[in-house]
């Protein structure tokens, strides 16, 4: 046991001593994020070989696409991925012990006149992943990319006419689900800028693109039509008061980068009303889902709501991004996504508890209680330690920005719960005497 623990501890340090970095930005990204990445892989019981492979892929294929290392004063591309505009986020499926990460690929042209809205860097990043693992299929990615992101002419026009103000500039992200020593690649696409270019709403673009796809792939059509009917009925009777019948708006879309016969489409909806009745409505599609599995999942949602002590209210996304190091004083809207499975007439919901801005120790304790109640004993015993060791120099009792979202779904009589986590300046940061500090609970270096 002692030898195994020692071997685990050596992965990040061994790779750090072995790796050469193309520049200081990449070196800083590695030492800022890899300690937490390693700790999560250990918590989820990945083998030593898998840890080396995933951290190696991260260093060689992902870090070169994270752009300049963020500081308070330096110019950088701001990503919608986090409230601080950082382009990388780790997440953990606690029920299946699967580590994931999401990033927005950035390259030297991003934000310049060559690619003012970061439309094209993702293609370069994809080439790296295709080289490292077989089975990646770009058919649906290419389709949605064409339908929902800017082409070169649209990008040039919006930039030259200065038409982009406070809109979400992120157009696409990549995510890797780490299964054993392999990964499953998926994409997330935001059509906000396409909406500006075409004059169509995000809702029209998202649902229109999936509707057209469903005409060709009829196996997802019944689920799509049920979801569309739900959204239309909700929005027909939406209000702006404190009822749960607020307007549902499309935010983004995702799909797996595998064969279209196996790929899933997910449509994400923003729910401004944070309340248990609103979440129940999202979960049941306004009463359209009423089978036993739905009811069992609903009971767990109610349990989580109570454990987390969620504060209800009407929310909106604040603007602009939070400065690095800022302590949040905000709570965000809720969200849900709906998976369109082949040959399943009912969309599968996944709801999100927006816990960003809530006390992280209280969230951790609530999750640990949930894990114990549902006999996820291994995760219950490790979760708190994983986060403490990821941020060892922080006053964990006072933090309120480590947890961003908690997602929940329930299928085949089994719950699935994931946490989405702040993944910046982790481990014994700063590693170097000249290291930059943005998040430091003990002192705040205002010069960085």
Curated annotation (Swiss-Prot):
It catalyses: L-tryptophan + dimethylallyl diphosphate = 4-(3-methylbut-2-enyl)-L-tryptophan + diphosphate. One of its GO terms (molecular function) is tryptophan dimethylallyltransferase activity. Keywords: Alkaloid metabolism, Transferase. The keyword Ligase does not apply. CDD domains: PT-DMATS_CymD. L-tryptophan binds at residues 80-81, 89, 190, 251. Pathway: Alkaloid biosynthesis; ergot alkaloid biosynthesis. One of its GO terms (biological process) is ergot alkaloid biosynthetic process. It is an enzyme of class 2 (transferase). Its EC number is 2.5.1.34. Substrate binds at residues 100, 186, 188, 264, 266, 268, 350, 352, 416, 420. Pfam families: Trp_DMAT. InterPro entries: Aro_prenylTrfase, Aro_prenylTrfase_DMATS, DMATS-type_fun, Trp_dimethylallylTrfase. NCBIfam families: arom_pren_DMATS, trp_dimet_allyl. Belongs to the tryptophan dimethylallyltransferase family. Homodimer. Catalyzes the first step of ergot alkaloid biosynthesis. Ergot alkaloids, which are produced by endophyte fungi, can enhance plant host fitness, but also cause livestock toxicosis to host plants. This is Tryptophan dimethylallyltransferase 1. It comes from Epichloe coenophiala (Tall fescue endophyte fungus).
């Amino acid at each position: 046991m002692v030898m195994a623990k020692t071997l685990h501890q050596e992965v990040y340090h061994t790779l750090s001593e072995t790796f050469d970095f193309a520049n200081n930005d990449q070196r800083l990204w590695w030492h800022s994020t890899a300690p937490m990445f390693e700790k999560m892989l250990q918590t989820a019981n990945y083998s030593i070989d898998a840890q080396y492979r995933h951290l190696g892929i991260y260093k060689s294929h992902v870090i070169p696409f994270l752009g300049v290392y963020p500081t308070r004063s330096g110019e950088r591309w701001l990503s919608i991925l986090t409230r601080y505009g950082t382009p990388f986020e780790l997440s953990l499926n606690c029920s299946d012990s699967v580590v994931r990460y999401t990033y927005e690929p950035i390259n030297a042209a991003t934000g310049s006149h060559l690619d003012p809205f970061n439309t094209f860097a993702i293609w370069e990043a994809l080439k790296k992943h295709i080289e490292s693992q077989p089975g990646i299929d770009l058919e649906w990615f290419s389709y949605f990319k064409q339908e929902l992101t800017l082409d070169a002419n649209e990008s040039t026009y919006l930039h030259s006419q200065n038409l982009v103000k406070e809109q979400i500039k992120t157009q696409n992200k990549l995510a890797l689900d780490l299964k054993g020593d392999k990964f499953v690649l998926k994409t997330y696409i935001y059509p906000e800028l396409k909406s500006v270019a075409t004059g169509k709403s995000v809702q029209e673009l998202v649902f229109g693109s999936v509707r057209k796809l469903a005409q060709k792939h009829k196996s997802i059509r019944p689920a799509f039509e049920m979801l569309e009917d739900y959204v239309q009925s909700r929005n027909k009777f939406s209000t702006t008061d404190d009822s749960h019948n607020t307007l549902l708006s499309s935010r983004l879309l995702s799909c797996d980068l595998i064969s279209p016969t196996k790929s899933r489409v997910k449509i994400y909806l923003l729910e401004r009303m944070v309340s248990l009745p609103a979440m129940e409505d999202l979960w049941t599609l306004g009463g359209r889902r009423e089978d036993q599995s739905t009811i069992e999942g609903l009971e767990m949602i109610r349990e989580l709501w109570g454990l987390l002590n969620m504060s209800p209210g009407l929310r909106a996304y604040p603007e602009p991004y939070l400065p690095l190091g800022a302590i949040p004083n905000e709570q965000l809207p809720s969200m849900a996504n709906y998976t369109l499975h082949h040959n399943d007439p009912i969309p599968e919901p996944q709801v999100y508890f927006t816990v960003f801005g809530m006390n992280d120790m209280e969230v951790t304790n609530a999750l640990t209680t949930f894990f114990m109640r549902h006999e996820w004993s291994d995760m219950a015993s490790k979760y708190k330690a994983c986060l403490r060791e990821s941020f060892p120099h922080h006053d964990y009792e006072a933090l309120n920005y480590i947890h961003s979202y908690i997602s929940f779904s329930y299928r085949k009589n089994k719950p699935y719960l994931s946490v989405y986590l702040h993944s910046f300046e982790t481990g014994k940061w700063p590693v170097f005497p000249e290291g930059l500090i943005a998040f430091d609970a003990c002192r705040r270096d205002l010069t960085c």
